[in-house]
């Protein structure tokens, strides 16, 4: 009996040590990116990184599905896909993403908005909070939106794929009123340009998890909650594909990125 108790205690100890090691492996201040933003914008839409593995690097984030089939949101450890039809659902963990960014979200600052904000005024408020030019910020908004406009792209099916800025006429827009939900996004510094989407970048998921997309425009209601997580490092997992190895990284795609972010050419 004594040996049995010792064996049980040994198993419990091993389990606790394993849990501690896993906890230590989680970097709560690090942004993880699978893929490369410029490569994705330039037409590398084939998924290479499985969702189940992506969730090992964070419980919060955004990205794109395989073959550009809509938009992704990662929230509370679950990954949701919104297709160009508007259909929104939790993904198959074995499916792949060509580009996604995640982190383990822990709010370092929280603000409850006392009035309505439109896109411009909210960005100005966030500018005052995320003023460090080298800072990496994960941003979560939760509450009711008076109005919100999102978009999603249809899937591509024939290679070579067309660069994303040339597919703006294919995007589908969705507009909602008086809808509860979450913004999931980032404000990333200029030195990350190319590898990721710099500046503000938000995706939306409704409270009912049946609507979403890349955020184009919005107006909040009062009492919106804003949470900001200050990150201090980032890591990137690049695809090991022939398409990636032969991609033209010398081309300046900054204007293409701007057009894709706002959903139109300026």
Residue map of PLM features:
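A hydrophobic, small-residue-rich beta->alpha segment in the mid-to-C-terminal subdomain
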Residues: 206-250
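Histidine-centered divalent-metal-coordination microenvironment in nucleic-acid enzymes
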Residues: 197-205
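N-terminal low-complexity or amphipathic/hydrophobic leaders
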Residues: 36-100
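Long, positively charged binding patches that form subdomain-scale interaction surfaces
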Residues: 123-186, 191-195
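A glycine-rich, hydrophobic loop/mini-helix early in the fold
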Residues: 82-129
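Conserved catalytic alpha/beta cores of large enzymes that bind or transform nucleotide phosphates
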Residues: 247-266
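Bacterial Sec-dependent N-terminal signal peptides
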Residues: 1-24
């Amino acid at each position: 009996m004594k040996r049995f108790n010792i064996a049980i205690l040994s198993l419990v100890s091993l389990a606790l040590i394993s849990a501690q090691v896993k906890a230590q492996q989680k970097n709560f201040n690090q942004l993880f990116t699978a893929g490369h933003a410029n490569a994705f914008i330039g037409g590398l839409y084939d998924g290479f990184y499985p969702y189940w593995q992506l969730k090992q690097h964070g419980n919060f984030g955004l990205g794109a599905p395989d073959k550009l089939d809509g938009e992704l949101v990662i929230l509370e450890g679950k990954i949701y896909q919104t297709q160009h039809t508007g259909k929104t659902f939790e993904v198959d963990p074995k499916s792949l993403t060509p580009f996604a960014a995640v982190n383990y979200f822990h709010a370092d600052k929280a603000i409850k908005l006392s009035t309505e904000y439109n896109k411009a005024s909210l960005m100005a408020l966030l500018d005052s909070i995320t003023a460090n030019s080298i800072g990496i910020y994960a941003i979560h908004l939760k509450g009711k939106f008076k109005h919100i406009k999102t978009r999603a792209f249809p899937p591509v099916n024939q290679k070579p794929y067309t660069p994303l800025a040339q597919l703006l006429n294919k995007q589908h827009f969705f507009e909602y009123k008086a809808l509860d939900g979450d913004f999931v996004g980032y404000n990333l510094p200029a030195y990350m340009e190319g590898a990721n989407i710099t500046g503000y970048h938000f995706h939306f998921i409704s409270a009912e998890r049946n609507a979403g997309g890349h955020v184009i425009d919005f107006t909040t209601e009062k009492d919106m909650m804003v949470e900001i997580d200050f990150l201090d490092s980032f890591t990137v997992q690049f695809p090991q594909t022939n398409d990636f190895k032969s991609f033209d990284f010398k081309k300046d795609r900054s204007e293409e990125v701007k057009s894709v972010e706002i959903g139109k050419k300026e």
